[in-house]
Curated annotation (Swiss-Prot):
Transmembrane segments: none annotated. It comes from the Eukaryota. Keywords: Cytoplasm, Nucleus, RNA-mediated gene silencing. One of its GO terms (molecular function) is endoribonuclease inhibitor activity. Pfam families: Arb1 (PF09692). Component of the argonaute siRNA chaperone (ARC) complex composed of ago1, arb1 and arb2. Interacts with ago1. GO terms for biological process: siRNA-mediated pericentric heterochromatin formation. The keyword Cytoplasm applies. This is Argonaute-binding protein 1. GO terms for cellular component: ARC complex; cytoplasm; cytosol; nucleus.
Length: 399
């Protein structure tokens, strides 16, 4: 897998391709048959491939000899790997293809002529091996370094968040498991022994990613938290008085939207339009909550600046407030590796007061993209959170 190869626009067959049906067929039970007998798909969370037989080890030594270029070895391995997994889930297929593409592997269809055409009597697994090929540009190593960990890190951070658009926890888990499953199989079959340490590091990163991405997903639904929402309702123009209008005023408003279904008109759930003092604050609710939690000092202040920033969490310190368990979260302004532009700001360090339970499962080094409002009394308000990003977040450098 090559560092920096964000998109492979090749449409033809570049590099060597191998039809695995040309190898001598094993007389013993194949790995695929043994897996089928065990009733496994190959995608179980803690799946382990069966120990290789002596015959399989010998075949692997032939297929993946270090005398063969790594690009050819990886092409051969990917072909066999695809045939030994069940691909009934379209999300898994899409993510695996995106992962390969990021690493410089282009997926396409073989062209057949003469005696190499598909044997219609072949088993489905053999037909798949004949028809689907993953290609790696033959000269890719002239321009890029091999770095399995880099590819895993970029794929499981910026790529799945902004290119794949994953939002469900289940899909985030699938993405991490795909990378880990694939790399463990590379190790198991001794495809790239010269990169063993790098591949093991990539496997560990995939495990770390699964924990962080799920934690970050849950945190993103809770931020900016009750206190910051209350502060925004007092100080930030976009939120001031947003929930002050009473329900009776809303129903009499000529612009109110009704939902029509089966010729019956009705109002959306009234609770959605009422301030609850938790995620939606009227001005009075916000003032009361801030007074109880922080004291009167934080009710005043003038906005001096507002910026959208990407920041990195560097520390969390518990604060001594009697009515609420709070912490001071310290962030530094941070530009992701590989980002196109540096942030145009004179800010370097931010301090935000948050409920301590929000960050219980958040590790230092986690990144946020959000809108910050700065007051003349030194208070910083995190009024909008756009994304919570993992510690290993990285983007792809422009070519």
């Amino acid at each position: 897998m090559a560092e920096g190869d964000f998109k492979n626009d090749s449409t033809g067959c570049i590099g060597d391709s191998v039809e695995f049906t040309t190898f001598k067929k094993r007389t013993g039970k194949s790995l695929g048959n043994r897996r089928k007998k065990r009733g496994l798909s190959g995608w179980e969370p803690y799946f382990q491939e069966p120990e290789l037989t002596a015959e399989e080890k010998l075949e692997n030594e032939t297929l993946y000899s270090r005398n063969i270029p790594l690009t050819v070895r990886m092409e051969r391995f990917i072909q066999r790997y695809r045939s030994r997994r069940k691909w009934s889930d379209p999300t898994r297929i899409r993510l695996f293809t995106m992962y390969l593409d990021l690493g410089g592997v282009s997926t396409g269809q073989k062209q057949f002529t003469g005696g190499t055409d598909i044997n219609n009597d072949a088993k489905a697994r053999e037909v798949s091996a004949q028809t689907t090929t993953d290609y790696i540009e033959y000269d890719i190593l002239d321009e890029y370094d091999i770095d399995f960990k880099w590819v895993a890190g970029v794929f499981l951070s910026s790529h799945i968040l902004y290119n794949a658009g994953l939002t469900k926890e289940e899909d985030l888990q699938i993405a991490c498991q795909i990378v880990r499953n694939f790399l463990l199989s590379v190790l198991h079959n001794n495809v790239a022994p010269e990169f063993e340490d790098n591949i093991r590091d990539a496997c560990l990163l995939a495990e770390q990613a699964e924990t962080e991405l799920i934690s970050n997903k849950r945190l993103s639904t809770k931020l900016p938290g009750r206190l910051q929402r209350a502060l925004a309702s007092i100080h930030v123009d976009n939120y001031k008085g947003l929930w002050d209008k009473s329900q009776s005023d809303r129903t009499s408003d000529s612009s109110v939207n009704f939902i029509e279904s089966n010729n019956t008109k009705f109002m959306p759930n009234d609770e959605l339009f009422e301030p609850d003092g938790i995620s939606r604050f009227s001005t009075q609710q916000a003032r009361d909550y801030i007074q109880r939690t922080l004291g009167p000092r934080y009710l005043t202040g003038k906005v001096v600046e507002q910026e959208y920033l990407t920041v990195k969490l560097v520390s969390k310190t518990l604060l001594n407030f009697s009515n609420q368990s709070l912490c001071k979260a310290v962030f530094i302004v941070w530009d992701p590796p590989g980002s196109k532009y540096s942030q145009d700001t004179n800010k370097e360090r931010l301090e935000v007061i948050l409920e301590s339970d929000l960050l219980n499962n958040t590790v230092d080094g986690t990144h946020l993209e959000g809108s910050f409002t700065f007051l003349d009394n030194g208070l910083t308000i995190l009024d909008t959170v756009l994304a919570v990003l993992p510690t290993f977040y990285e983007e792809v450098k422009d070519e």
